[in-house]
Amino acid sequence: MKPSPASTPVGSTLRISLVCNTAWAIYTYRQGLIRTLVARGVEVTVIAPRDRTFDLLAQMGCRCIDLPVASKGTNPRDDLRTLWALYRHYRAIRPHVVFHYTIKPNIYGSISAKLAGVASVAVTTGLGYVFIQSSRTAQIAKKLYRFAFRFPREIWFLNRDDMAAFTEQHLLVHPERARLLHGEGVDLEQFAPTPLPESNQVTFILIGRLLWDKGVGEYVDAARQLRARYRDVRFQLLGPVGVDNPSAISRDEVAAWEREGIIEYGGEAHDVRPFIAAADCVVLPSYREGVPRTLMEAAAMGRPIVATDVPGCREVVTDGINGLLCEAKSATSLAEKLAQMLDMSGAARREMGERGRQKVAAEFDERAVVERYTDLIRNLTGVSL
């Protein structure tokens, strides 16, 4: 079904809102979109829990509004607070289009937008615990998805597996509104190829929020196994710790791994490029993903990858071509693939990285993704950007 354009008076400023459970994710994954919208005169509002990226988003030209979201919680009162807060913001801002990301904004934001008479788009950035677990909470979340997803004008999925999961489990009342975005893209100029480090020591790095669901525990266990067999190898972690997520890893747990001498923790970084450039291989043993930005960035910079054979990761990695795929939730399988990478020659790793750059350039160019956004905005508002 093609939605009818929203009313946008000639000469008025186009207002677009981006809503997520972390401002960090908006800043990290959607800079290209924000720059394009701001440069074309759009009033961009980011609605998310306040964090240190609010200032950075403001510097880019965004208006930022704090949002109460209990990502870890299942208290209905907290969720109603989120729904009511979004409804009030939408009534006050009157955005022409709202894009929702992550579970709670997708569910409660879609409902709030409908109540406020605002056009919305749901972007499923990865299904997370809803499809990893079979708990009562996960079953309730699926029912909420089915109810809320009758309201967005379009529902975007980042990979075919997630789209198929929603379709097969009958969570889409209007399946004709589903679209495949195929990842959120990467800036190919910003993440340019760099040569592999010239060192006899091989460095692995896992970049992302430190969550058990990202396979951090398996990564640490695999590192522990391999350190007993290989001398010249380093295992690094980079990303926020103790985040508001049911699967969060604490700083104390990371500190214990550091004391044991298994891993090196680099903290957080706004710019991950120096860390990717200093690594020989990027690792992501996640249980499930949308299409992981980390892997797109790594491939764009010419790094071979070791990842799990799960939705999202296998969108970026073709086993044996630009990286290696291992079993999910298996430190043994991960250790085997990391050992295989260690036993390769530097030339073989370089060739894998070069093929990864070619794949990302062909399939994940951020410019094509931004064009999908601007095309939809035009269809919904009648305004060409």
What are the roles of these predicted feature ranges?
Residues 304-307, 317:
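Short hydrophobic beta-strand element within catalytic cores of glycosyltransferases
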Residues 268, 287:
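Aromatic "clamp/platform" in nucleotide-sugar-dependent glycosyltransferases that forms part
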Residues 195-214, 219-223, 236:
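Conserved donor-binding/catalytic core segment of Leloir-type glycosyltransferases
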Residues 318-320, 324-331, 340-346:
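Conserved acidic donor-binding segment of nucleotide-sugar-dependent glycosyltransferases
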Residues 48-52, 207, 234-249:
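Glycosyltransferase donor-sugar binding loop
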Residues 347-363, 369-375:
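A short, well-ordered alpha-helix in the C-terminal region of glycosyltransferases
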Residues 65, 146-193:
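Donor nucleotide-sugar binding/catalytic pocket of nucleotide-sugar-dependent glycosyltransferases
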Residues 2-3, 74-78, 167-168, 182-201, ...:
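Acidic anion/phosphate-binding donor-loop and adjacent secondary structure
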